[in-house]
């Protein structure tokens, strides 16, 4: 279920039931564009190796969501994120994970037009994306290929490598005028036996070491590592990937807050980095 917490009253809603096995990887606030209605959206996130239809959901009111678009059978595995782009007046959807399902989609006219503009390469697989005047800044989310921070040019959909990273990326945030990406310690994710899925600790080839890395920077100053922690010794899939999670939205404070998950030092603690 998807629940809502009223911060004024402290009341938790009764919840919304998505389709079977579907959950949001993250919520996206769509705003400052005329081509798609302003609201909160999420895309269906599930394993879905058979590429069953996957939907995009729009919030209408408390516990009321409606399907605004559905990817057909054999198109994608799941939705990673939706990104408002006020500079191009459109919405971008990033999907995964394998082959042509690893794709970038451009949405206009309230989902009447959904165009796949890039696909069939792990460099288009991303969960953390920022719309900038120069293009789309994002980090890749592939455990079995080298990780990079890329900038996509929306004029011709070409991508330029900005900086290498030591793993896949699922979480990130904007901190003032800089962008933060954290890497993931995880397995390959493909062709796993049941035993490997339950108890495996072999990293994907794109995961360079046992550390969760945090990178911070922008196009003007470049990116550098600002923090890291080692993954704990527990299996990836039965327990948790090693990651850093961040609060959503723009952080304009002097402190960067985050939560390490499945690390051997500060697991589940609230951490603070100061400028």
Predicted regions span which residues?
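Short coil/turn segments that connect the beta-strands within blades of beta-propeller domains
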Residues: 37-38, 87-89, 133-135, 176-179, ...
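Structural motif
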Residues: 1-4, 49-57, 99-106, 144-152, ...
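Repeated scaffold domains used in trafficking and secretory/extracellular systems
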Residues: 21-33, 75-83, 119-133, 163-178, ...
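Loop/turn-rich, solvent-exposed surfaces of beta-rich toroidal or solenoidal domains
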Residues: 134-147, 163-242
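Residue-level signature of beta-propeller blades and closely related beta-rich strand-turn architectures
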Residues: 44-48, 71, 96-98, 142-143, ...
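A short beta-strand motif characteristic of beta-propeller blades
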Residues: 11-19, 65-72, 113-119, 158-163
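Blade-level signature of beta-propeller repeat domains, shared across WD40, Kelch, NHL, RCC1
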Residues: 241-275
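Short loop/turn segments that connect beta-strands within beta-propeller blades
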Residues: 6-10, 60-64, 108-112, 152-156, ...
């Amino acid at each position: 279920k998807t629940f809502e917490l009223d911060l004024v009253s402290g009341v938790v809603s009764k919840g919304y039931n998505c389709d079977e096995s579907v959950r949001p990887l993250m919520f996206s606030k769509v705003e400052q564009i005329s081509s798609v209605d302003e609201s909160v959206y999420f895309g269906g996130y599930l394993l879905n190796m058979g590429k069953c239809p996957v939907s995009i959901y729009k919030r209408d009111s408390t516990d009321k969501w409606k399907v605004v678009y559905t990817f057909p059978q054999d198109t994608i595995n799941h939705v990673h994120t939706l990104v408002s782009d006020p500079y191009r007046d459109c919405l971008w959807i990033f999907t995964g994970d394998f082959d042509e399902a690893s794709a970038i989609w451009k949405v206009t006219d309230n989902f009447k037009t959904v165009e796949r503009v890039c696909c069939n390469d792990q460099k288009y697989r991303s969960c953390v994306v920022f719309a900038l005047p120069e293009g789309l800044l994002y980090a890749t989310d592939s455990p079995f290929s080298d990780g990079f921070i890329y900038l996509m040019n929306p004029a011709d959909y070409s991508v330029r490598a900005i900086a290498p990273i030591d793993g896949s990326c699922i979480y990130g945030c904007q901190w003032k005028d800089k962008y933060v990406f954290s890497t993931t310690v995880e397995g390959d994710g493909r062709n796993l036996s049941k035993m490997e899925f339950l108890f495996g600790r072999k990293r994907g080839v794109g995961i360079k070491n046992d550390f969760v890395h945090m990178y911070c920077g922008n196009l003007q100053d470049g990116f550098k590592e600002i923090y890291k922690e080692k993954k704990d010794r527990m299996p990836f899939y039965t327990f948790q990937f090693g990651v850093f999670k961040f609060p959503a939205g723009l952080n304009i404070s002097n402190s960067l807050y985050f939560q390490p998950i499945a690390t051997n030092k500060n697991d589940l603690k609230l951490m603070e980095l100061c400028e």
